[in-house]
Structure formats: C-alpha cells, structure tokens
Amino acid sequence: MTKFIFVTGGVVSSIGKGIVAASLGRLLKSRGYSVSILKLDPYINIDPGTMSPFQHGEVFVTQDGAETDLDLGHYERFTDTSMSRLNCVTTGSIYQAVINKERRGDYNGGTVQVIPHITNEIKERILRVAKSTNPSVVITEIGGTVGDIESLPFLEAIRQFRKEVGRQHVLYMHVTLVPWIASAGEMKTKPTQHSVKELRSIGIQPDILVCRSDRPLPKGLKQKLSGFCDVPEECVITSQDAKSIYEVPLNLEREGMAEQVLNLLQMEQRQPDLTQWQTLVQRLHTPKHELEIAIVGKYVQLSDAYLSVVEALNHAAISTYGKLRLRWVNSEDLENESAETHLGGVDGVVVPGGFGVRGVDGKIAAIKYARDRQIPFLGLCLGMQCSVIEWARNIGGLTDANSAEFDPHTTNPVINLLPGQQEVVDLGGTMRLGLYPCRVLPDTLAFKLYQEDVIYERHRHRYEFNNAYRDLLLKSGYAISGTSPDGQLVEIVELPKHPFFLACQFHPEFQSRPSSPHPLFKGFIQAAIALSLSTSTTPTPLEVS
C-alpha cells in the first residue's frame, strides 16, 4: 500500500518545506522507491496562472498543461519525475469543486460545510495522486505556516487522514526554525516548541522535526527538543543552511532522515545510491571556468520569477564545470540607458518569458546588443518573439514591426495571436499549455544540440510567429530551425552566422534536470564559456553544416 508523508511548516514562511519535501523524495528514490509529491496551497486562486510574478514567483507548467506552484519545479528536478495537474491543489480549486457538486445536487440537499465536505474533497485529492501512478510514497507539502487561518482545512484533513488509512501508513513531518540569537550566544528552541504546541492543538503530533538553522544542532539541544515536543531524539533532524539547494539531500542523508522515515512507516531499509548526486555537488564545488550571464527581464526584482531559468543555467554550468554569476538586468532600464552600460562584459544574454508591453523595448535592445556584439543569446517564449521583432525592424526593413500583443493596430504584426485565441475572454488556463511536439530541422544549431528529429517541450503562450512574414525574414538571413509537426507554428529560430543565437517559443527550462541539463542551456553555456576564455573580441561561430 502507498505510504503518505505530510510536511508542515512552522514559525516563519519560506522556511524551505518544498526543498525538504523534494530532498526526501530524492533520498527515497535513491533507495528504489517511487515517489510523487503533492502541494496543497491555501490561497483562493484556482491556480497561480493569473497571479503576479512579483507576488508568487514563476508559474511552473507541467506536461499536461497545468499552471502550478514553483515548488513543483523543485519536486521534478530533485526526483527526476514529471508531475501533473493532480500534484497542485489550491483552496480555490477545492471550493470550486465542492460548489460545483452542490450545484449539481450531489449532496442531496444537505448543508455544505468545511467539515466534512471541504476536508473530504482534500482527502480525495491526496488519494487521487496515489491512485494515478501507484507510487510507493506520496509526499504532501502543506503550504503556509501552522497557525494561519487559511491552512486549517488542510490540517484538519490530514489529521483525519491517518485514522482513515491507518497509522502505520502515515507520517507527519514538521519543518521549523531554530534561530541563533547573537546577543545571547545560543540557539533558541522556544519558537519550535510553540509551533509544535500549535500543531498538537489541531490534533497532529509530528513524528519527525526538521530544524532549519544556520549551524548544526548540538546533541543537548536535540535532547531538549525531543523532550518538549515528544519526538524521539533520532527524529530531530538538522537542516543547516547550505550554499546550494543541491547540497540539502546529502545533508539530510547524513542526518539519517530517510532511515527514520522508513522505520516509522515500516518500510524495508535499502542501501541508497547517491553517486550521481554526489558527483553533481562535487562538480558544483570544483569549477574550472567562471562566466557571467545577464538575465534581462521584467520581474528581476524577485528572482523566483525566473526560478526554473536560473536552475537550468545552473545545471548546464555545473555539467561543464562552470561557476555561474548572474547579472540581473531590468529591461525597463535599457529603454532609457545604453545596453553597454548594463550588459558590457557579460558572456551571455538570456531574455526569458513574460507578458505585456512594459519593458519590451528594453528586451529588444538587449537582443540587438547580443546580436551585434556576437554575444551568446538564448531567448525563451517572449524572448523569441522579441528576437523576431528586433530582426524584422533592424534587418528585415520593417521599422514598425511589432507584436499584436503590444500594439493591436500595428501594420506589421510579425507576432500574432494563435489560431483560436481571438475569441478567448478568460485569462486563466486558456493559453497553449503543456507538452507539444516540435520537428527539428536538419543542418541547424538546434539539431546539433538536440540530436533528434522530433522533440517535446512545454509551452505557455497565446501569441506566435506570424507566417505571413516567414519568407521575408528567411530571405534576410533569419533561420527557422524548429516547427510544429505540420510546419505551421514556428517553434525555434536562430542565426547561423552567430556564435550562438537561438530562441524558442517554448519553455525548455521546465525540462532541465540536475543530472541531465537541457541541451539548449548546455549549448548556450558552452558558447558563453568559449567567449569568456577567448582572447579575441569576436569569437568564432559554432560550425553548423
């Protein structure tokens, strides 16, 4: 039978529950167990798809087209397992489902209440994940902090869950903060004690305490927490701050977390195989090259808005023994100041996705700078659209070229709405979302990187390359290297005579893994390293037959 682990958080938000859940998933998978990880988010939005990146960070898109919390990216990257729309549940989606059932008459005229109707729906969503892929373990992260009113229905549901599926099949893990108070010269356990007290008042006794701190917990302090929180000493786990999130699974393995989890759930103890992960961390700490990459975006004030892009760059850099430094560039700054001021000296430029006209001219200026200066360039989604506009304006002779998104009345809409999008009114869940095939054309940089005729990538967009301008741009030297299987949708463009200039309509960052960096990011980083090592101001272009 599937086992269930529930991860809650206390004391402060953003304490790292998602990384703990993902790390535990990795440790279990290294022992041969299959894992699925579920996020229960307490906000009332149906999904994060329409939420501001400044508030919520990036929207992570699953293969089946769900717009989900960024933590699902951590789950996929750490466990190397693709999640689905079943793995992200919000309060809004729960209430929507219950209200729809009430409208259909499913409750036979009964009074619809938080208990049992909302809690039953939550439990059903958890069981649905277990039934869908039949994993050995389902790990469920409860968003928010214990004590928040928004989380109460979720906590009540997981309290009931243990009784219904059996105590031996359920484990509660509580992630909390043990701060170091410099003025006192000691670590304080009181916040954790109060957090556990709050959790116990709801009816949940944690089986394992994961204590986030900036230093190891002394044995005496673990004994103290064990006594006050009624948790065995060996189940008080230190989660010490790390320079990289990829160190966390190894740190938790040294603390014996997986061993205790298997003991408590009465599962077979198996020898872990973490060789691949250890190699990853070893490469992380022994770089041979240093390079600086500029990310030119609209939401750079919150780096989480581009989390998967950053991680994909890290994966590629680690695989090539590169030490990555990021230069965050607000695209709006490039509209009033020279590109040289903000991009001078970088080894590569990434223009990621986004929506709306704000800052677009700055993105276009960054792309022109990278093209003119022969600096490796990678455009993602909106980044591809901006690269098409830049080329059309400056090389194709269409000085007023634009996207219909930015100027609905432009005379040269080189980027236009996808077919079927003209009548769409709602914003949420209505774009081209999820995994789609792409035909990679031979004798192109894209084919050299992928080494495959057909690839599958995740999409999240409403606008596309306008085929009315295809011949014009091709004649001016622009190259199309990837299309939909029917050839109608342009998916990848590139410049053959540039060291590395490639842009794609999809989001390759969602498919990158620490153990298998995405080919586009790896090729981009290799080109950036070549530039950083070059003594010439004009690097030699990559050869494409």
Swiss-Prot record:
Q: Where does UTP bind?
A: S13, K188, T189, K190, P191, T192, Q193, K224
- Membrane-spanning residues where? none
Q: Please list the GO terms describing molecular function.
A: ATP binding; CTP synthase activity; glutaminase activity; identical protein binding; metal ion binding
Q: Which domain of life is it from?
A: Bacteria
A Gene Ontology cellular component where this protein is annotated is: cytosol
Q: Where does CTP bind?
A: S13, D148, I149, E150, K188, T189, K190, P191, T192, Q193, K224
Q: Where Mg(2+) is bound, by residue?
A: D71, E141
Catalytic residues, chain numbering: C381 (nucleophile), H507, E509
Question: What does the UniProt record note about how this protein's activity is regulated?
Answer: Allosterically activated by GTP, when glutamine is the substrate; GTP has no effect on the reaction when ammonia is the substrate. The allosteric effector GTP functions by stabilizing the protein conformation that binds the tetrahedral intermediate(s) formed during glutamine hydrolysis. Inhibited by the product CTP, via allosteric rather than competitive inhibition.
Question: Which catalytic reaction applies to this protein?
Answer: UTP + L-glutamine + ATP + H2O = CTP + L-glutamate + ADP + phosphate + 2 H(+); L-glutamine + H2O = L-glutamate + NH4(+); UTP + NH4(+) + ATP = CTP + ADP + phosphate + 2 H(+)
InterPro entries xrefs = Class_I_gatase-like, CTP_synthase, CTP_synthase_N, GATASE, GATase1_CTP_Synthase, P-loop_NTPase
Q: Which residues bind ATP?
A: S14, I15, G16, K17, G18, I19, D71
Q: Which UniProt keywords apply?
A: ATP-binding, Glutamine amidotransferase, Ligase, Magnesium, Metal-binding, Nucleotide-binding, Pyrimidine biosynthesis
Start and end residues of each stretch annotated as Amidoligase domain: 1-267
Task: List the pathway annotation.
Answer: Pyrimidine metabolism; CTP biosynthesis via de novo pathway; CTP from UDP: step 2/2
Write out the GO biological process terms. 'de novo' CTP biosynthetic process; pyrimidine nucleobase biosynthetic process
In what residue span(s) does the Glutamine amidotransferase type-1 domain sit? Answer: 292-534
EC numbers: 6.3.4.2
* Family recorded in the similarity comment: Belongs to the CTP synthase family.
The entry's other comment says: CTPSs have evolved a hybrid strategy for distinguishing between UTP and CTP. The overlapping regions of the product feedback inhibitory and substrate sites recognize a common feature in both compounds, the triphosphate moiety. To differentiate isosteric substrate and product pyrimidine rings, an additional pocket far from the expected kinase/ligase catalytic site, specifically recognizes the cytosine and ribose portions of the product inhibitor.
According to its UniProt entry, the function of this protein is described as:
Catalyzes the ATP-dependent amination of UTP to CTP with either L-glutamine or ammonia as the source of nitrogen. Regulates intracellular CTP levels through interactions with the four ribonucleotide triphosphates.
NCBIfam families named in the record: PRK05380.1, PyrG
Assembly and interactions?
Homotetramer.
Name-wise, this protein is: CTP synthase
